[in-house]
Amino acid sequence: IEQAIDLDDSYPTLLTLARLEKRKGHSYILKSIFNLKKIYPDIQYIIAGEGDQLENVKKEIKNYNLESNVKLVGTINENQKKFIFSKTDIMIMPTIDETHANSIEGFGIAYIEAAQYGIPSIASNVGGTPEAVLHNKTGLIINNFNELDESIKNLVENKQNRIELGENAKNRAENELIWEKQVVKYNKLIDDIQ
């Protein structure tokens, strides 16, 4: 995968690590990348995952002429994930609110995985996502897709803010969200109840 991802480390790289489903918002991200490419011609975006929207995503990449900006890497293993996180500056996954769908957005483990690497996230105010990404603390929460371009632009242009959000995300992941620490908290809670 290292050969497939030839990235310029001097420019921020965005990542979506999720199944390719309509509700994960890939189409909105690609539209934003297209819009922002006018300002940042070298913007880089990695899509890791597979799903029923793969062909649609490929068509959109071609229609927006983003072949040199977007890398589709498919399903990745843990070692590949570590490599990709080492190349990522911004995690982005603006899930669509599908209130009446069979599947809703849970906590968002991918955000926490990114946080462990000091990567801030851009996410939607949907389901359990605001519990995983704290707005203006560990990333940015958007309320609608009109805010997506501006949120990406904010983190691309403001490196210091991006670094601070990433550090906050990493500290929170290490100190509050690691499973072992959660188990201790739950055990204490159970003991207190008894």
Where does each model-flagged region fall?
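Short acidic alpha-helix that forms the nucleotide-activated donor recognition element
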Residues: 55, 77-88, 116, 134
